[in-house]
């Protein structure tokens, strides 16, 4: 075989193995996500993550209102 063909085959094999490794690496995460979705844990985790951010946002909003209330009008 010519060197060009060997290089092309090597590149194709390299790309295919890279994609296979990425897919194999995703499998445990997909299985864990599927199990947690079946058990209903994922929804609770997302709600727990969202609520503190919402509280912090409200606190920041109140702080800004106080700051702007004390500023003079021009």
From Swiss-Prot:
Record's keyword annotation contains Secreted: yes
Q: Which GO terms describe its cellular component?
A: extracellular region; membrane; other organism cell membrane
Q: What is this protein called?
A: Peptide Im-4
Which species is this record about? Isometrus maculatus (Lesser brown scorpion)
- Propeptide residues per the UniProt entry: 40-74
Q: Which UniProt keywords apply?
A: Amidation, Antibiotic, Antimicrobial, Membrane, Secreted, Signal, Target cell membrane, Target membrane
Chief location of this protein? secreted
Q: Where in the cell is it found?
A: Secreted; Target cell membrane
Tissue pattern of expression reads: Expressed by the venom gland.
Modification type Lysine amide: residues: 39
Q: Which family does it belong to?
A: Belongs to the non-disulfide-bridged peptide (NDBP) superfamily. Short antimicrobial peptide (group 4) family.
Anything noted about its domains? Amphipathic and cationic peptide with an alpha-helical structure.
Span of the secretion signal?
1-22
Query: Miscellaneous notes for this chain?
Result: Fragments comprising residues 4-17 and 5-17 have been detected in venom but it is unclear whether they have a physiological role or are simply due to degradation.
Would you kindly state one Gene Ontology biological process term found in this protein's UniProt entry? killing of cells of another organism
Q: What does this protein do?
A: Antimicrobial peptide that probably forms pores in target membranes. Has antibacterial activity against Gram-positive bacteria S.aureus NBRC 13276 (MIC=5-10 uM) and B.subtilis NBRC 3009 (MIC=2.5-5 uM) but not against Gram-negative bacterium E.coli NBRC 3972.
């Amino acid at each position: 075989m010519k060197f060009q063909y060997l290089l092309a085959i090597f590149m194709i094999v390299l790309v295919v193995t890279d994609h296979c490794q990425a897919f194999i690496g995703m499998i445990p995460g997909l299985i864990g996500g599927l199990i947690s979705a079946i058990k209903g844990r994922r929804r609770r985790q997302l709600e727990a993550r969202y609520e503190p951010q919402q509280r912090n946002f409200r606190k920041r909003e109140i702080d800004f209102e106080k700051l702007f209330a004390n500023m003079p009008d021009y």
